[in-house]
């Protein structure tokens, strides 16, 4: 964590590499919660103004609040009062804007789940470094972006450092889903409703009436509704349709197996 006197790195540069962007992010997201907010946000805005003007320390002028408000209206796309990583990528001149490149490839939660299914080749519930590298390679090809092996390696390591919250060198589904725009990230809706393995097994067994080891989309509908009602949360038909479509992207021929649903609903991916 950066000390209060440490100068923010790289804000003055005309273009940032992926690694430099990450250093800026880690400097200002001091508590590591995935957002720049509150005092962190004020500090970021002041330092950004200072870097852009090339002036001395900025004093808090009368119009600081108004300038901050305009800044947030421009860049806080989902109006939650916080800056997330992809919003920061819009503010700073990031080289080849690799985060936006991701989002063009997995623009919806259903596409994201399909990509997850493709690259979680061993069905472990994680994408490991070698699998992530393949994911990024395909991504860059789709976007017609030239790259060499060192650049691909840099992107792989940078994405790991960005999203690998527990530092184990691999990305779980909830970590990887932070690549999605917040409004598309249906997995965020399940935060606070994560099940233990015992709870998950009980609810899956209840809906898998014939003990086949999988459920279909109608049974998934009922399961999701049940989960929301038990947690006293509301879900409309449109949300239910979106969540079902996203989760069913993990299914095989309309069959959603226990292990795949467990990745979405459990606190920890299956062992």
Curated annotation (Swiss-Prot):
Residues binding Ca(2+) 1, per UniProt: 29, 31, 33, 35, 40
Binding site for Ca(2+) 3: 120, 122, 124, 126, 131
Pfam family, one: EF-hand_1
GO cellular component, one term: cytosol
Metal-binding is among the record's keywords: yes
Modified sites of kind Phosphotyrosine: 214
Keyword Transferase: no
Ranges of residues in domain EF-hand: 16-51, 63-98, 107-142, 151-186, 195-230, 235-270
A GO MF term: calcium ion binding
GO biological process: intracellular calcium ion homeostasis; regulation of synaptic plasticity; synaptic signaling
Binding of Ca(2+) 4, residues: 164, 166, 168, 170, 175
Binding locations of Ca(2+) 5: 208, 210, 212, 214, 219
SMART domains reported for this sequence: EFh
Known function: Calcium-binding protein involved in calcium homeostasis and signal transduction. It plays a critical role in buffering intracellular calcium levels and modulating calcium-dependent signaling pathways. Predominantly expressed in specific neuronal populations, influences synaptic plasticity and neuronal excitability, contributing to learning and memory. During embryonic development, it facilitates neuronal differentiation and maturation.
Protein name stated in the entry: Calretinin
Organism listed in the record: Rattus norvegicus
């Amino acid at each position: 964590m950066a000390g209060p006197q440490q100068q923010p790195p790289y804000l003055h540069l005309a273009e940032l590499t992926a690694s430099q962007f990450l250093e800026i992010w880690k400097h200002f997201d001091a508590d590591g919660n995935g957002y720049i907010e509150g005092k962190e946000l004020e500090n970021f805005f002041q330092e950004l103004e200072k870097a852009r003007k090339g002036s001395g320390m900025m004093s808090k002028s009368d119009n600081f609040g108004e300038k901050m408000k305009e800044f947030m209206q421009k860049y806080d796309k989902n109006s939650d009062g916080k800056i997330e990583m992809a919003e920061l990528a819009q503010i700073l001149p990031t080289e080849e804007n690799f985060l936006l490149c991701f989002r063009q490839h997995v623009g919806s939660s259903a596409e994201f789940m399909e990509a997850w299914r493709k690259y979680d080749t061993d069905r472990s519930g994680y994408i490991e470094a070698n699998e992530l590298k393949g994911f990024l390679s395909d991504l860059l090809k789709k976007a017609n972006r030239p790259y060499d092996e060192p650049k691909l390696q840099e992107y792989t390591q940078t994405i790991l450092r960005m999203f690998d919250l527990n530092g184990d060198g691999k990305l779980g589904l909830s970590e990887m889903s932070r690549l999605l725009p917040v409004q598309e990230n249906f997995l965020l809706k399940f935060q606070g409703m994560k099940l233990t393995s015992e709870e998950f097994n009980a609810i899956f067994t209840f809906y898998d009436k014939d003990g086949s080891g999988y459920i279909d989309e109608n049974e998934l509908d009922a399961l999701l509704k049940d989960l929301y009602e038990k947690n006293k949360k509301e879900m409309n038909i449109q949300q239910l349709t979106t969540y079902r479509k996203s989760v069913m992207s993990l299914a095989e021929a309309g069959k959603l197996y226990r292990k795949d649903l467990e990745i979405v609903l459990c606190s920890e991916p299956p062992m």
